[in-house]
């Protein structure tokens, strides 16, 4: 197997296959669940709006892939600084049956100099999650500066985040290798690689992209660090490219490119 094919297979099993569009329907989510199951393995998870969790759970169970995890989003996509609303949404997501919650960090508050609200929001959302994985989206493409990206990453980790995630996919600039490196370095430098994972989201579209991101993680955190507990790709159009690279002809219904 070529290096690119090996990376493609690795990436497929780390995907949070995503549809987070305003026109999402039960039918689109059912189709997404079908796409999560491929001839070469399943994606790690799907990522959907909370209201679709029950239909997704049913579909995944019926197609024999109940192990595909269901991630959902809260405080999404704007990352407001209302802790009460973020926590209420997170509690509701847990009640719906989410396996994982991707919450948006109040990044604009941090840009305005407020470090406390982000810490408190993440801390309370993690308390609401209990054992459920909490991924925190810091919106790197809006923070832009290394100092802010590293500070947001540190705050999230100190507040109990299980993962730090680059982006919502809803702003002009999403995951980039430059931002990914900054966040991976924080995980390394804080000594939390055992407990904290990383998720680039938006803009990872090809097997070559995925291979480069994985090589970077191997370089910074070691060859054995990347697994589904420590690394995810938030993507939709990536799956088709990975399957093409692997020469698997599964028909994939492509949600709007993410």
Swiss-Prot record:
Compartments it resides in: Cytoplasm
Reaction(s) catalysed (UniProt annotation): 2-deoxy-D-ribose 5-phosphate = D-glyceraldehyde 3-phosphate + acetaldehyde
Keyword RNA-binding tagged: no
Pathway(s) per entry: Carbohydrate degradation; 2-deoxy-D-ribose 1-phosphate degradation; D-glyceraldehyde 3-phosphate and acetaldehyde from 2-deoxy-alpha-D-ribose 1-phosphate: step 2/2
Entry GO terms, CC: cytoplasm
Biological-process GO terms, alphabetical: 2-deoxyribose 1-phosphate catabolic process; carbohydrate catabolic process; deoxyribonucleotide catabolic process
The entry's keywords: Cytoplasm, Lyase, Schiff base
Family matches, as SMART domains: DeoC
EC number: 4.1.2.4
Xref: InterPro entries: Aldolase_TIM (IPR013785), DeoC (IPR011343), DeoC/FbaB/LacD_aldolase (IPR002915), DeoC_typeII (IPR023649)
N-terminal signal peptide: none
A molecular function GO annotation: deoxyribose-phosphate aldolase activity
Catalytic-site annotation from UniProt: 102 (proton donor/acceptor), 165 (schiff-base intermediate with acetaldehyde), 199 (proton donor/acceptor)
CDD domains xref list: DeoC
Entry superkingdom: Bacteria
Protein family according to the UniProt entry: Belongs to the DeoC/FbaB aldolase family. DeoC type 2 subfamily.
Role played: Catalyzes a reversible aldol reaction between acetaldehyde and D-glyceraldehyde 3-phosphate to generate 2-deoxy-D-ribose 5-phosphate.
UniProt-recorded name of the protein: Deoxyribose-phosphate aldolase
Gene name per UniProt: deoC
């Amino acid at each position: 197997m070529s290096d690119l094919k090996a990376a493609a297979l690795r990436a497929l099993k780390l995907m949070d296959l995503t549809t987070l569009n305003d026109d999402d329907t039960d039918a689109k989510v059912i189709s997404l669940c079908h796409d999560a199951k491929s001839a070469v393995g399943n994606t790690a998870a799907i990522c959907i709006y909370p209201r679709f969790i029950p239909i997704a759970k049913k579909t995944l169970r019926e197609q024999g892939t109940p192990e595909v995890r269901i991630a959902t989003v809260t405080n999404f996509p704007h990352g407001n600084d209302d802790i009460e609303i973020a926590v209420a949404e997170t509690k509701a997501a847990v009640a719906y049956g989410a396996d994982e919650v991707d919450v948006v960090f109040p990044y604009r508050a941090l840009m305005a100099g407020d470090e406390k609200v982000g810490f408190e929001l993440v801390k309370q959302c993690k308390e609401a999650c209990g054992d459920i994985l909490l991924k925190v989206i810091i919106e790197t493409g809006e923070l832009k500066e290394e100092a802010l990206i590293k500070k947001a990453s540190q705050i999230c980790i100190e507040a109990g985040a299980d993962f730090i995630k680059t982006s919502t996919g809803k702003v002009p600039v999403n995951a980039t290798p430059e931002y990914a490196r900054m966040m991976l370095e924080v995980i390394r430098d804080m000594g939390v690689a055992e407990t904290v994972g990383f998720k680039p989201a938006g803009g990872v579209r090809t097997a070559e992209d995925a291979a480069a991101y994985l090589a970077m993680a191997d370089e910074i955190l070691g060859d054995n660090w990347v697994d589904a507990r420590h690394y995810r790709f938030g993507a939709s159009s990536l799956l088709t490219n990975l399957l093409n690279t692997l020469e698997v002809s599964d028909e994939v219904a492509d949600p709007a490119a993410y």
